[in-house]
């Protein structure tokens, strides 16, 4: 009896919720998609990944952890143009944010790997980054009883390279920044954006920013040549090897200056911009984009509107806006 | 023995055959029981999913091509799904035909190469298509911007620039057409138009420069990108992902057919081996039944043998019993003979003195003075008439009265002597009567319980041996405690005592350096046991004989028959008593002790 009534009650409740939701907030069908929720994972695994993320033992001289360059309080990257590698020298590319990285179709600026696991390995072994190797990492972690216990709790085979990668990847999948105002707008709360921000979104679409920055991560799902409508690197001057982008990886002329289109989520808090950190402000970045990617000259007003829109893409981490 | 080993060998052979068949069956079962159909179905299902995703991918590419959507996520997700499904497919151990394995692997590699190529092309397509769509979408706006500039010019100037405006518009149209129908001709047209625009730009006012530049830039981009996008689309369409997947399916089908064939073969084998096993089992069952029958037969034989054996044992037991009773009888007879011998010996001794007495009497009778009386009477009879004279006158007559007086005295002495001798004789006869009556009172009496005075019985026993004892100069020491009359078997007790005393006497027959002494002891032990012991100072019993002395036929004497102690022990047991021997060693004498229940004569009637 009580079972039946409970079922009925929950049915009614579900109906109410559905109708309510339908009335209040039907998700918008846009080329930009709302941030998905964090996937269900083993909390112990995620916790282990969190510890590893902050673990300097992963680097060759126990000085750098993932968190050394990816500051979660400030946008998931550091505010330097180039983070300092293990040897204290700056790395050749601007550090991308770790936030929402799991939503990117490939990792790194040149999209050189497809999975978070591979990304972790590259960062860990990369000579300019943590410069370590798996043997040393396994040894360092196994020497620590806490880690031995924690690994044994989650993985049958204890400490191993694959398990370190898996734990870190699990943690990184939780590093999503939900609840940005634009996400709320996409989910149907159209009142949350100001009229100017809505105009900004409109301009964003009209000018064709959306051609590359779209999808669930507002970018991060394609490669694009930097300088479609003009030679950006010539204009910038001082060309360096890392400007070649994907070409370094494939050697294909087609890939010269081709980079992964970065996500625009939290773009307002992840300055400086571009792989070369050449744009210090959002305005600079938008200018470059207009000139070299869109080949258009926006009005000052439109540009400001777009920037206002871009600021609505800042989400929350640990319940606080970034 | 040989038969046994042959049986063992055949058993081992059977076991080996059974083991071999069973393991072959298990092997065949494992070989044929893999659910291959399911695996193939699942694998084919995965490939079908891959094909669906591939088709979905293609359709998303086309959608992006005609700019239905700006979202490029759908061009990413099919690939990641396919990668996931592919790894799932590879995790499966689907392929079975080892001969064709390289072909299968080659097909897989071909698929991987195709999908990588397609992914590369799709990525390129995304990049180029995005900018192309942007420019195409922007083209009318760009042209509008130029037209707006035209509109701002006065009518005079506009008339001058009418040609330029028319050219620009034509260029826009041909560019848009180019997007639809890409051909080299049109490309050439557009190139010409772009050249014209560049020339026209020179004659245009400065405010026109930027919009025209932008327009021409975008048109050049379209001119550049459109063929690229088209060729990319063709190349994407040409990537044989679907064909490779079909190849994989074909491969799987062939493999399944092969596997099915092998499976059928294994099934046949399984059937054959099962039949063999069943035959073997049947054979074993028959053997088992036969061995059961054999066991039953043997059991029955054993049972009957057992019964016979029991009967034989019974018979033998009976024989033994008979022998024992015979033995007992003979022992008893032997005992009785011994008693009789003793008795006769004693009787003989007494008869000797009877004989002497009788001789003496008869000799005295033969030399009797009574004969002188007859001569005197003859003299008297011859002188009947003149008796007086004769007595007074005659010489002889005068002597007669004196003679008669002497005769009377002599006859009186003679009578006295004979009377003494006859008294002795009758005493001896009494003795014999005693001995005989003693013997008679024991002989033949069965286990009759009667009141016994132990002391008197001991004395009787001694008396029966009295001759031998006195002949061997044996001193008897009696240590009789005060024992009440008991109820017992007089005959057996006497038998035991006579034997023990006789043995003691024999044991001391070789004793010369010291007096021979037998000590008889009677005492009550506790309230219910009577202990009678016969102790001698004789040759003793060596320890090795101690255990044997009561056994039948054991004797240390030349003329002994080995019945004595054995029958005594038997008699003791029959009286619910016990006969035991003790000796401190050879030459130290021995003590034989009889213990019997002390049943008071008054206690039972």
Range-by-range predicted roles:
Chain A
Residues 2-12:
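Bacterial N-terminal signal peptides that target proteins for export
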Residues 5-6, 23-322:
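Periplasmic c-type cytochrome electron-transfer domains
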Residues 10-20:
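Bacterial N-terminal signal peptides
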């Amino acid at each position: 009896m009580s079972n039946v009534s409970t079922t009925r009650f929950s049915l009614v409740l579900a109906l109410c919720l559905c109708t309510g939701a339908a009335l209040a907030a039907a998700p918008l069908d846009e080329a930009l998609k709302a941030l998905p929720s964090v996937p269900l994972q083993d909390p112990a695994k995620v916790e282990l990944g969190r510890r590893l993320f902050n673990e300097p033992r992963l680097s060759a001289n126990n000085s750098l952890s993932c968190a050394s360059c990816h500051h979660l309080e400030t946008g998931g990257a550091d505010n330097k143009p180039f983070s300092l590698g293990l040897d204290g020298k700056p790395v050749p590319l601007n550090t991308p944010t770790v936030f929402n990285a799991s939503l990117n179709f490939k990792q790194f600026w040149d999209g050189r790997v497809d999975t978070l696991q591979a990304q972790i390995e590259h960062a860990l072994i990369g000579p300019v980054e943590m410069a370590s190797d798996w043997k040393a990492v396994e040894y360092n972690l196994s020497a620590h009883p806490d880690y031995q216990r924690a690994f044994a709790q989650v993985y049958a085979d204890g400490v191993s390279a694959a398990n370190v990668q898996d734990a870190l990847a699990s943690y990184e999948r939780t590093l999503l920044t939900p609840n940005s105002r634009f996400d709320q707008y996409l989910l149907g709360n159209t009142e949350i954006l100001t009229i100017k921000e809505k105009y900004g979104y409109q301009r964003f679409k009209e000018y064709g920013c959306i051609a590359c920055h779209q999808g669930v991560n507002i970018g991060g799902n394609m490669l694009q040549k930097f300088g479609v409508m003009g030679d950006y690197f010539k204009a910038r001057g001082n060309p360096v090897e890392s400007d070649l982008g994907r070409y370094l990886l494939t050697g294909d002329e087609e890939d010269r200056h081709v980079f992964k289109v970065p996500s625009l989520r939290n773009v307002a808090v992840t300055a400086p911009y571009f792989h070369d950190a050449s744009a210090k402000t959002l305005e600079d970045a938008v200018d470059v984009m207009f000139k070299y990617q869109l080949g258009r000259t926006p009005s000052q007003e439109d540009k400001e509107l777009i920037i206002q829109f871009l600021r609505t893409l800042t989400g929350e981490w640990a319940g606080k806006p970034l | 023995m040989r038969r046994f080993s042959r049986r063992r060998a055949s058993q081992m052979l059977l076991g080996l055959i059974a083991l071999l068949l069973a393991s072959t069956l298990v092997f065949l079962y494992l070989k044929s029981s893999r659910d291959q159909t399911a695996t193939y179905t699942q694998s084919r299902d995965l490939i079908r999913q891959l094909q669906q995703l591939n088709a979905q991918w293609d359709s998303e590419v086309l959608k992006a091509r005609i700019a239905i959507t700006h979202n490029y996520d759908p061009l990413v997700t099919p690939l990641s799904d396919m990668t996931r499904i592919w790894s799932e497919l590879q995790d499966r151990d689907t392929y079975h035909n080892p001969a064709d394995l390289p072909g299968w692997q080659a097909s897989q590699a071909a698929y991987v190469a195709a999908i990588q190529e397609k992914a590369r092309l799709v990525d390129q397509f995304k990049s180029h298509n995005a900018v192309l769509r942007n420019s195409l979408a922007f083209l009318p706006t760009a042209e509008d911007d130029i037209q707006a500039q035209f509109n701002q010019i006065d009518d005079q100037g506009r008339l001058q620039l009418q040609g330029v405006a028319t050219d620009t518009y034509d260029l826009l149209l041909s560019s848009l057409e180019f997007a639809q129908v890409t051909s080299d001709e049109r490309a050439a047209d557009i190139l010409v138009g772009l050249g014209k625009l560049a020339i026209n730009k020179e004659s245009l006012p400065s405010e026109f420069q930027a919009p025209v530049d932008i327009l021409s830039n975008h048109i050049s981009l379209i001119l550049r990108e459109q063929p690229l996008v088209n060729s990319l689309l063709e190349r994407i369409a040409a990537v044989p992902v679907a064909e490779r997947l079909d190849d994989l399916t074909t491969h799987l089908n062939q493999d399944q057919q092969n596997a099915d064939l092998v499976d059928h073969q294994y099934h046949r084998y399984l059937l054959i081996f099962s039949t063999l096993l069943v035959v073997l089992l049947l054979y074993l069952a028959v053997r088992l039944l036969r061995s059961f029958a054999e066991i039953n037969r043997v059991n029955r034989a054993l049972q009957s043998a057992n019964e016979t054996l029991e009967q034989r044992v019974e018979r033998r037991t009976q024989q033994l019993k008979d022998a024992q009773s015979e033995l007992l009888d003979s022992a008893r007879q032997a005992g009785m003979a011994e008693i009789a011998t003793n008795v006769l010996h004693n009787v003989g001794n007494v008869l000797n003195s009877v004989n002497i007495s009788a001789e003496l009497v008869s000799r005295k009778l033969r030399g009797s003075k009574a004969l002188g009386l007859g001569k005197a009477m003859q003299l008297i009879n011859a002188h009947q008439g003149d008796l007086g004279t004769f007595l007074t006158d005659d010489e002889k007559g005068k002597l007669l009265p004196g003679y008669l007086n002497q005769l009377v005295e002599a006859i009186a002495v003679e009578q006295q002597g004979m009377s003494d001798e006859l008294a002795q004789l009758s005493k001896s006869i009494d003795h014999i009567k005693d001995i005989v009556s003693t013997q008679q009172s024991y002989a033949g009496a069965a286990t009759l319980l009667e009141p016994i005075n132990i002391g008197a019985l001991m004395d009787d026993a001694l008396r029966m041996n009295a001759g031998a004892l006195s002949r061997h100069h044996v001193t008897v020491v009696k240590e009789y405690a005060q024992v009440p009359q008991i109820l017992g078997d007089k005959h057996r007790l006497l038998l035991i005592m006579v034997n023990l005393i006789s043995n003691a006497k024999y044991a001391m027959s070789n004793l010369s350096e010291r007096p021979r002494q037998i000590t008889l002891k009677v005492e009550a032990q506790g309230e219910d046991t009577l202990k009678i012991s016969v102790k001698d100072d004789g040759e003793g019993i060596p320890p090795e004989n101690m255990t044997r002395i009561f056994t039948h036929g054991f004797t240390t004497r030349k003329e002994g028959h080995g019945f004595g102690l054995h029958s005594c022990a038997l008699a003791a047991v029959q009286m619910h008593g016990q006969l035991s021997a003790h000796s401190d060693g050879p030459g130290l004498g021995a003590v034989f002790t009889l213990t019997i229940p002390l049943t008071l004569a008054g206690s039972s009637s």
